[in-house]
Curated annotation (Swiss-Prot):
Major localisation: cytoplasm
Protein's cellular compartments: Cytoplasm
Ranges annotated as spanning the membrane: none
Leading EC class: hydrolase
Gene: hslV
Regulation acting on activity, per entry: Allosterically activated by HslU binding.
Pfam entry (one): Proteasome
Lineage, opening ranks: Bacteria, Bacillati, Bacillota, Bacillota incertae sedis, Caldicellulosiruptorales
PANTHER family linked: ATP-DEPENDENT PROTEASE SUBUNIT HSLV, METALLOPROTEASE TLDD
Binding residue positions for Na(+): A161, C164, T167
EC id: 3.4.25.2
Active site: T5
Name by which UniProt lists this protein: ATP-dependent protease subunit HslV
One of the record's GO cellular component terms: proteasome core complex
Catalyzed chemical reaction(s): ATP-dependent cleavage of peptide bonds with broad specificity
């Protein structure tokens, strides 16, 4: 499990949102930064990505993923499969410790270095140390409220931050 971050993504109707907290924890016991941006828009603002794990590793993977998107003309499904395959097989990349959540208006995926590419059945994904809390909160909010995808993502992350010591309330939300 990766400490020091929480990312949650929610797809609802024609909208998709991803939210990330801003905490960077060093050596599992010291907050180094509280305003980090762990969610981004890629491919001319058409793809959302959030990452958990080692910062340098996550940035490297984000750059690799952006290359795949360019090579595949923005085809998210093909790009994540190619990234996961390369991530698992490449001697350098397979040592990277990170997880990614990626989404466009049609798909939402969790991608890992062990080759997993998972598209959740309920259109909600959460990773990082606060991921289980954010996932549970997002599911409850999706089922019991009329909130938008962005509002659900923000509230789910706020709930996770109130429980997980590796997650803070400095939340960035991006939406398509």
């Amino acid at each position: 499990m990766f400490h020091a971050t929480t990312i949650v993504a929610v797809k609802k109707g024609e909208s998709v949102a991803i939210a990330g907290d801003g905490q960077v924890t060093f050596s599992q016991n010291m907050i180094m930064k509280s305003t980090a941006k762990k969610v981004r828009k890629l491919y001319n603002g058409k793809v959302l990505v959030g990452f958990a794990g080692s910062v340098a590793d996550a940035i490297t993977l984000c750059e690799k993923f952006e290359e795949k998107l360019e090579q595949n003309s923005g085809n998210l499904q093909k790009s994540v499969v190619e990234l996961a395959k390369e991530w698992r097989q490449d001697k350098v990349l397979r040592r990277l410790e990170a997880l990614m959540v990626v989404a466009d208006k049609d798909h939402l995926f969790v991608v890992s270095g062990s080759g997993e590419v998972v598209e959740p059945d309920d259109n909600i994904a959460a990773i990082g140390s606060g991921g289980p809390y954010a996932l549970a909160a997002a599911r409850a909010l999706l089922q019991s409220t009329d909130l938008s995808a962005a509002e659900i993502a923000r509230k789910a992350l706020e709930i996770a931050a109130s429980i997980c010591v590796y997650t803070n309330n400095n939340i960035t939300v991006l939406e398509l």
